[in-house]
Amino acid sequence: MGRLDGKVIILTAAAQGIGQAAALAFAREGAKVIATDINESKLQELEKYPGIQTRVLDVTKKKQIDQFANEVERLDVLFNVAGFVHHGTVLDCEEKDWDFSMNLNVRSMYLMIKAFLPKMLAQKSGNIINMSSVASSVKGVVNRCVYSTTKAAVIGLTKSVAADFIQQGIRCNCVCPGTVDTPSLQERIQARGNPEEARNDFLKRQKTGRFATAEEIAMLCVYLASDESAYVTGNPVIIDGGWSL
């Protein structure tokens, strides 16, 4: 018996990183996983794993989300993962950067929740997990102005949904990781003028002396998706290797 046997789980940004690790972990625990991403070629790599079906989805497009929701009969868990990390202070953040970050990091979650929550309410049970970050209202982080703003908004969204629908059997939590070794992190390191220095800068802020793995984050997500966490709702769950201490 798996910890997620019989559960239908939809997640976004499943083609790589935390999303991919979570999709694989969910499937190993017996869930039926519907993995979505905008990157069709990388998403297809998941199709070889039992229990996972894939669907191309741009989470910034309301029409696509609504069409997808109409195709889904039921779901038990919605995991909103998609996001973008902008590097810089408020002075480095142009309006287009601000708008893009807000659109992908916050509005996409609003659209997904609004589309799929009615199905959960109809079945009188549901579980929503949102990807936030320690770089949010949890901790002020240098050069993460718009990113931290969006992730603080995700915490607010999470608490609001949890409070509004707790009596209808809905749970909503968010995951707040520290620095995770993902393709996204490696891209950000390589984009800096001195990648080795950039990597060391990222490592310095982790008191454990290492990055988290995507698989470590995924195992927390398995717990939040399972009935083991039935009494947990409205919480920003921190997994940061002591960064916020």
Swiss-Prot record:
Record's subcellular location: Cytoplasm
UniProt entry tagged with the keyword Cell wall biogenesis/degradation: no
Listed EC numbers: 1.1.1.-, 1.1.1.30, 1.1.1.104
A single cellular component GO annotation: extracellular exosome
Activity dependence on pH, as recorded: Optimum pH is 7.5-9.0 with (R)-3-hydroxybutanoate and 6.5-7.0 with 4-oxo-L-proline.
Keywords: Cytoplasm, Lipid metabolism, NAD, Oxidoreductase
Catalytic activity: cis-4-hydroxy-L-proline + NAD(+) = 4-oxo-L-proline + NADH + H(+); (R)-3-hydroxybutanoate + NAD(+) = acetoacetate + NADH + H(+)
UniProt induction comment: Induced by low iron levels, and down-regulated by elevated iron levels.
Functional note: NAD(H)-dependent dehydrogenase/reductase with a preference for cyclic substrates. Catalyzes stereoselective conversion of 4-oxo-L-proline to cis-4-hydroxy-L-proline, likely a detoxification mechanism for ketoprolines. Mediates the formation of 2,5-dihydroxybenzoate (2,5-DHBA), a siderophore that chelates free cytoplasmic iron and associates with LCN2, thereby regulating iron transport and homeostasis while protecting cells against free radical-induced oxidative stress.
Protein known as: Dehydrogenase/reductase SDR family member 6
Organism: Homo sapiens
Lineage of the organism: Eukaryota, Metazoa, Chordata, Craniata, Vertebrata
Annotated gene: BDH2
